[in-house]
């Protein structure tokens, strides 16, 4: 591993005079990271460059290739056309985001133009190094133009590279010498990464010699594994910046007591004192410590916006914390030039954008004497939300940026943000990766970020430039979120990020890439197997699994009534050859890539109950709907609803006030807290709790009655006084209620009676949904076997909730949750195939494996049609013992969705009492 060192005076002597002159005009000197990267790249070695955002990685990757292209173009400019190098792409840049690719293409124009001008000024020919971009937004005419006249540098995405390799456009790639993969960390741990790894090996098969691979990554663990992902069978040198990013991260709570939020005063809307006037405290029951089932469910529901956000909750006179958060955010936006506000869901992104615009309009309206009682008008969708209402004042302070915003609007927001013309953007992870946003001087995060790695990326958007200090604040919405925010902040300061694990032997991705490769060439099965095994995610692929995929694609499971199992390729076993069938190439490009269609069901009232037809209550994840039946009681927001009907795309509900209900989940927003982060969370709670109850706290009392060591730790983590106070009071309240704090070493089982007289058994655990979901499955299986009823288990990041009917027998407790590790593994493996998760993931895997034909290239069938067809396929597939996509679906559930390794280790610790 090469560590960045101090720059040397001769770092640029390896480049031409023109490149050196341009660089020194643009920058004071190379960064240590750039110099180390150039040492490796100059020698032709593969390189993985790891550094925080804004450290000059991209220019480090491109500059050698640009210099070589410029010299070659200048040297051959006077030669006859037939003696010049042939047309073709020389540098291939792959980005996980189209926006990032477009940003890189824009940023390349300055060095290309500047270096070319210097060469011309020195008396040489004006070299022209051309760039081009191919993504899903590229029109057919543009694609044909790229094929006729390929650029020297092509910017693309993993999916578009696959499409090029599966068409005649691949001929333009036979000249590639350098492949740059940006944001490697965002790809390596997913099926998208496995797909790209196979595409890179297919690309190498086209070339006379393997291309030099350069990977760019934010801070990542483990480095060697990511390097192996990048290089496949080839060695990769890791160049890493060992210094921690320069950050100033704060955790801010805008009220003194989050369980007794003062009513937000309507007249105090300006300046930092916003919200201090108004009525006295009014207790918010859902924010109390975890004293009951209702309180825990409220705490576990912290990832969703309060139900009344679109009505009284975010309005004047409310005792919600939201008006205080909104006012604090607006104060920060007005105090800075440009601000990004990150949130964790698209719905919250839209709502917060609308509220900031609304609040800004009201502040300006008061200043200008605008009639604030004028009729409200919807915010225009290009400026904010279509889901909320705002006064007629123009919404000029904030715009939304997320995956559902149109391409044109996203580009407009990015341009305005980069130019410093837009004061605020509210975004999801769509702006998390390395788009150059050097004008951003503040990042705010509402609720804790999904992980420490994500937090580093998001806060790193501020001052995204060499030497810039990133400044950001996290606004928890509940007391329990303060814990997650503090853990994220501490993890950022200490560089403790979560590990990335490669997705291994994904058979659905293998099936898609096999059809694509065979569509272009007749292949020897053994040669294709060797190509596949060169890719790191498939380096341990068993030949038996490989052959099972070939058998499936060759029609082994074809039946008269299921065309989806009909053969995609021909496998000539006698000759060991793989051949295309008519239409193979079309099938390969119709459903390219790995990003799944994830579906949501609208939740509506019956017709006639709403003022204007069916009134929308919310939406549910399709996996939640698969688990639901007519008559079930569910919670949306703070209300309970009884399901009266489930249609192909809607759930029709009726109010069920006062009824005990299941809490919904949404897998589309992420898989939940990593177990590693949960362990950090538990250790943090254990340390803080010890500082409250120990002798040290009494002897050396710091702020809020905690030990000096804990007080100093919380302050170093960036918690303001109110954040510290609320965190300490949460821990005290929990100890008063149960006598013990759940942490990484101590899991707490709590029992209480619910509203209907049944018992709730709750397991408090920090280890996250990926651990808790399979654990809850095993517990449900045990309860059914012993007691004969369904416990209606619900798992979330903070634990498991069971519903136990009131009986005369002894109420079960901790014995429900303790398992032999191997027994638990067996139960989960046996039961996973009957879960809603399995059904939903089977549909996605079947689509990736090209078993569900779309309507047309790039167009998906309606989700209800996909679900119907997938159900038929699943029923047929279950009759085959080792159907590859059943095997893959089980692998995805057990390895990618569930964290069975962490659960197994946890059960071993429970057994050992450690």
Mark where each language-model region is:
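Extended, highly charged accessory segments
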Residues: 529-532, 536-600, 664, 672-914
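Short beta-strand-centered aromatic/proline hotspots
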Residues: 639-646
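N-terminal pre-P-loop "Q-motif" helix
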Residues: 28-43
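ATP-binding Walker
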Residues: 55-56
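Short, basic/aromatic beta-hairpin or loop at an interaction surface
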Residues: 598-619
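Short, solvent-exposed secondary-structure boundary/capping segments
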Residues: 647-664
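Helicase motor core with emphasis on the C-terminal RecA-like subdomain
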Residues: 6-11, 15-21, 42-48, 60-158, ...
């Amino acid at each position: 591993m090469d560590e960045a060192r101090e720059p040397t005076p001769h770092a640029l002597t390896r480049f031409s005079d023109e490149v050196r002159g341009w660089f020194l005009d643009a920058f004071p000197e190379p960064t240590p990271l750039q110099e180390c990267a150039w040492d490796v790249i100059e020698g032709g070695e593969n390189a993985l460059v790891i550094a925080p955002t804004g450290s000059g990685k991209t220019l480090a990757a491109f500059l050698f290739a640009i210099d070589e292209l410029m010299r070659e173009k200048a040297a051959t400019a006077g030669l006859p056309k037939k003696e010049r190098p042939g047309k073709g792409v020389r540098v291939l840049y792959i980005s996980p985001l189209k926006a990032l690719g477009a940003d890189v293409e824009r940023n390349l124009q300055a060095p290309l133009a500047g270096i070319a001008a210097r060469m011309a000024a020195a008396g040489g020919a004006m070299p022209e190094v051309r760039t081009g971009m191919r993504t899903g937004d590229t029109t057919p005419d543009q694609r044909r133009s790229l094929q006729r006249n390929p650029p020297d540098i092509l910017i693309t995405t993993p999916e578009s590279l696959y499409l090029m390799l599966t068409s005649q456009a691949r001929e333009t790639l036979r000249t590639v010498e350098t492949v740059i993969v940006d944001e490697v960390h965002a790809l390596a741990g997913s099926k998208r990464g496995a797909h790209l790894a196979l595409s890179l090996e297919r690309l190498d098969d086209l070339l006379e010699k393997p291309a030099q691979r350069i990977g760019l990554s934010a801070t990542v663990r483990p480095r060697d594994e990511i390097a192996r992902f990048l290089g496949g069978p080839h060695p990769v040198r890791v160049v890493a910046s060992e210094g921690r990013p320069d950050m100033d991260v704060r955790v801010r709570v805008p009220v003194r007591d989050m369980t007794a939020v003062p009513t937000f005063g309507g007249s105090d809307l300006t300046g930092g004192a916003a919200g201090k006037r108004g009525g006295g405290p009014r207790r918010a029951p859902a924010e109390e410590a975890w004293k009951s089932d209702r309180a825990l469910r409220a705490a576990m529901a912290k990832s969703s916006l309060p139900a009344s956000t679109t009505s009284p909750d975010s309005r004047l006179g409310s005792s919600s914390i939201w008006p205080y958060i909104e006012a604090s955010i607006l104060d920060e936006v007005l105090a800075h030039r440009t601000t990004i506000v990150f949130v964790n869901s698209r719905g919250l992104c839209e709502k917060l954008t609308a509220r900031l615009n609304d609040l800004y309009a009201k502040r300006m309206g008061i200043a200008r004497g605008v009639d604030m009682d004028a009729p409200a008008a919807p915010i225009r969708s290009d400026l904010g939300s279509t889901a909320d209402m705002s006064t007629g004042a123009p919404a000029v302070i904030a715009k939304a940026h997320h995956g559902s915003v149109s391409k044109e609007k996203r580009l407009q927001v990015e341009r305005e943000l980069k130019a410093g013309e837009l004061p605020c953007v509210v975004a999801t992870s769509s702006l998390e990766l390395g788009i150059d946003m050097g004008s951003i001087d503040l990042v705010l995060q509402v609720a804790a970020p999904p992980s420490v790695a994500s937090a580093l990326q998001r806060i790193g958007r501020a001052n995204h430039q060499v030497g810039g200090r990133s400044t950001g604040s996290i606004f928890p919405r509940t007391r329990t979120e303060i814990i997650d925010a503090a853990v994220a902040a501490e993890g950022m300061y200490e560089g403790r990020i979560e590990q990335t694990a490669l997705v291994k032997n994904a058979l659905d991705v293998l099936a898609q890439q096999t059809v694509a490769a065979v569509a272009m060439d007749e292949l020897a099965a053994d040669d294709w197997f060797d190509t596949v095994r060169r890719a790191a995610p498939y380096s341990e692929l068993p030949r038996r699994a490989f052959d099972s995929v070939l058998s499936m694609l060759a029609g082994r499971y074809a039946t008269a009534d299921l065309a989806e199992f009909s053969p995609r390729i021909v496998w000539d076993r006698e000759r060991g050859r793989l051949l295309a069938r008519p239409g193979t190439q079309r099938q390969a490009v119709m459903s390219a890539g790995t990003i799944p269609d994830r579906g949501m069901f609208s939740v509506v009232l019956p017709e006639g109950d709403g003022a204007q037809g069916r009134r929308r209550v919310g939406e549910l994840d399709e996996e939640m709907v698969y688990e639901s039946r007519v008559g079930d009681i569910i919670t949306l927001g703070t209300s309970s609803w009884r399901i009266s009907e489930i249609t192909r795309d809607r759930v029709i509900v009726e109010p069920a006030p006062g009824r005990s209900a299941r809490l919904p989940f949404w897998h589309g927003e992420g898989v939940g807290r990593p177990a590693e982060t949960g362990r950090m969370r538990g250790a943090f709670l254990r340390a803080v709790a010890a500082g409250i109850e120990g002798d040290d706290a009494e002897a050396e009392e710091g702020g809020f009655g905690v030990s000096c060591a804990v007080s100093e730790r919380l302050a170093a983590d960036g918690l303001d006084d109110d954040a510290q106070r609320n965190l300490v009071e949460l821990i005290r309240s929990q100890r008063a209620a149960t006598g013990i704090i759940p942490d990484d070493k101590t899991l707490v089982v709590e029992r209480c009676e619910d509203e209907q007289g049944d018992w709730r058994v709750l397991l408090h655990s920090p280890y996250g949904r990926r651990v808790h979901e399979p654990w809850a499955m095993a517990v449900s299986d045990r309860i059914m076997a012993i007691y004969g009823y369904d416990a209606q288990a619900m798992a979330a990041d903070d634990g498991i909730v069971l519903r136990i009917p009131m009986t005369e027998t002894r109420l079960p407790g901790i014995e429900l949750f303790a398992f032999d590790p191997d027994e638990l593994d067996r139960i989960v493996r046996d039961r996973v195939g009957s879960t809603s998760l399995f059904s939903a993931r089977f549909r996605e895997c079947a689509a990736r494996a090209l078993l569900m034909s779309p309507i047309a290239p790039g167009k998906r069938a309606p989700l209800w049609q996909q679900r119907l067809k997938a159900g038929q396929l699943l029923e047929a597939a279950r009759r085959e013992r080792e159907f590859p996509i059943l095997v893959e679906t089980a692998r995805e559930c057990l390895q990618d969705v569930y964290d069975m390794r962490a659960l197994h280790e946890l059960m071993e610790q429970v057994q050992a009492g450690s």
